[in-house]
């Protein structure tokens, strides 16, 4: 079962990316290193509700 999620920057707290994940394979919160246009650098983005 795939669900849509939002990824928020850990530094500026803005929700920059939307993606989906498989809840059966990834039960915890997803963390990806993505580019933040407001910080102008790559930061860790975490899954939000």
Swiss-Prot record:
It comes from the Bacteria. It comes from Nitratidesulfovibrio vulgaris (strain ATCC 29579 / DSM 644 / CCUG 34227 / NCIMB 8303 / VKM B-1760 / Hildenborough). GO terms for molecular function: structural constituent of ribosome. PANTHER family: 50S RIBOSOMAL PROTEIN L33, CHLOROPLASTIC (PTHR43168), LARGE RIBOSOMAL SUBUNIT PROTEIN BL33C (PTHR43168:SF2). Keywords: Ribonucleoprotein, Ribosomal protein. InterPro entries: Ribosomal_bL33, Ribosomal_bL33_CS, Ribosomal_bL33_sf, Ribosomal_zn-bd. The keyword Transmembrane does not apply. Belongs to the bacterial ribosomal protein bL33 family. HAMAP family: Ribosomal_bL33. One of its GO terms (biological process) is translation. The gene is rpmG. Signal peptide: none annotated. The keyword Ribonucleoprotein applies. GO terms for cellular component: cytoplasm; ribonucleoprotein complex; ribosome. This is Large ribosomal subunit protein bL33. The lineage of its organism: Bacteria, Pseudomonadati, Thermodesulfobacteriota, Desulfovibrionia, Desulfovibrionales.
